[in-house]
Amino acid sequence: MTGWTGRAADVRMAKLCELTFTAVEYQQLRHAIEDNYYFEFVVDKLPMWGFIGETKLEGGTYRPYLFTHLHFHLAFNGDQLIDATVSTDAKLETVLLDPSSAAAAPNDHAETRESTASRESVEFTYSVTWTHTDVPYSRR
């Protein structure tokens, strides 16, 4: 027994938090995305990793995008967590625009949440999918 006693309930989309960045934090975040920083979560001693964002070449300029949605896929067997992974959803990313730039106008990506980040708050969301597996805890 792992001590995990969760209930297997899927979460379609839920708000995790909302953050407003200072100008210094904004620049640090931009640099972290440009330098391919990643996060690590650990659930029941199972590590999960993912990038905090990505850069995309648009009109000859690389623009940093912050991943603002995380999807967790959790597999269980009985009351034991067997596998845990996390992925990002590119449809729910936020472009980090330079607040001093004239380029802070809406872009062509209708599905992308756009923010100047130092002027607006950025909402972070998550979803969870639970699946049953026959893999025993001893083989996780």
Task: Kindly label every feature range from the protein language model.
Residues 1-140:
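Soluble extramembrane domains flanking the early transmembrane region of eukaryotic membrane proteins
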